[in-house]
């Protein structure tokens, strides 16, 4: 089956927006792109969804269909809640799909650090981040 990449929701400013990107094959890619594509120096940082290459906005109904059914073509599902300082990640890291929750600011710090393995860095700091799976 073709990998469709990841589906993600960005909550902030009282709204939610939904996206997919075939170039994001997992949370590690998502984190890396947050830093790599933040924008040009001296300008305001790009919005999160514009940092993700080939991000395509989808409707809430499409998001719900993908996320609720855990569409097997997608390698991960990510929800970024900026106001609540949360990043929810549902990804198969080797033992089936599992749900994780990290502080948004910690994810951004790891992105800025250029950590080779964001999972390792975040799980070392937040060992209870795994919520299920």
Task: Annotate each predicted stretch with a short phrase.
Residues 1-6, 81-85:
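A short, compositionally biased
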Residues 4-14:
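Short aromatic-glycine-(Arg/Gly/Cys) micro-motifs in beta-strand/loop hairpins
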Residues 21-28, 102, 113-117:
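Alpha-helix boundary/N-cap detector
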């Amino acid at each position: 089956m073709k990998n469709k990449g990841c589906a993600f929701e960005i909550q902030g400013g009282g709204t939610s927006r939904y996206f997919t990107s075939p170039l994001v094959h997992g949370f590690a890619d998502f984190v890396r792109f947050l830093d790599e594509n933040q924008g040009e120096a001296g300008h305001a940082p790009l919005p999160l969804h514009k940092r993700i290459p080939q991000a395509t906005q989808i409707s809430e109904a499409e998001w719900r269909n993908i996320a609720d059914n855990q569409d097997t073509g997608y390698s991960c599902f990510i929800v970024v809640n900026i106001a609540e300082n949360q990043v929810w990640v549902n990804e198969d890291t080797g033992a089936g799909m599992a749900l994780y929750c990290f502080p948004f600011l910690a994810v951004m710090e790891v992105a800025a650090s250029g950590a080779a393995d964001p999972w390792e860095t975040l799980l070392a700091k937040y060992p209870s981040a795994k919520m299920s799976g």
